[in-house]
Amino acid sequence: FTIDLNNIWAKNKHFDSSKHTILLNSHLDTVKPNKGYTKDPFYPHSENGKLYGLGSNDAGGALVTLLGTFLHFHNEKDLPFNLVFAASAEEEISGKNGMEFLFSRLPKIDFAIVGEPTLLDIAIAEKGLMVLDCKSIGKSAHAARNEGVNAIYEAINDINWFSSYVFPKQS
C-alpha cells in the first residue's frame, strides 16, 4: 500500500496495465463531533446490533466493506480486471489533498465504486461541490453621478444567472 498525505491506496498484487481498472473508493475523514453526542464519538460502541461512533455511518461501513472486497481479490492471479483501493481524505471539506490529489498518482481508472450511504439504493451520480473564484469588473465614478459601473451589481447578475442555471441531465 501507499500513503500519500492522508490518503491510503493500493493496487491488486497481479496488476496488469493492459486490463481495465476498477477503483474501490470511500473516504476516511469525518466531520467534527457535535455537542449533542450522548456517547463518546471516538470509541466504537455496539448497542442492540447498531454501531455508534464517529464514521460508523458515513462512511466507515462502506470503507471497510470495500477494503474487505479488495483484500478478497488482492492475490488472485487471473482476474479479468485490476482493482485499486483508495481510502481518501478531505471529502468532508472538498479539499485538494483527497481524490483530486490522488488521481494524478493512481493508474488509469475505467470504472469506480464509491462507498457512500445511499439507503441501500444504487446511485449512479451524486451532487458535488463547485467552488468558483470570480472577478467582477466595474468602473469607478463619483457616487453622486451615475457614470460608473457598480461591480457588485454586475456580480449579482452573474450570481443570479448561475443560481438558476440547470445543468443538462446526462448519464
Regions found by a protein language model. Name each.
Residues 27, 126, 142-144:
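Histidine-centered active-site/metal-ligand motif
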Residues 1-20, 42-45:
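A non-catalytic alpha/beta surface segment that caps or lines the substrate-entry region
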Residues 17, 29-31, 120, 141-142:
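Short, acidic Gly/Pro/Ser/Thr-rich loop/turn segments
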Residues 144-171:
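Acidic-enriched catalytic cores of C-N bond-cleaving enzymes acting on peptides and small amides
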Residues 59-131:
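Acidic/histidine-rich catalytic neighborhood of metal-dependent amide-processing enzymes
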Residues 19-84:
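Active-site metal-coordination/substrate-binding segment of hydrolases
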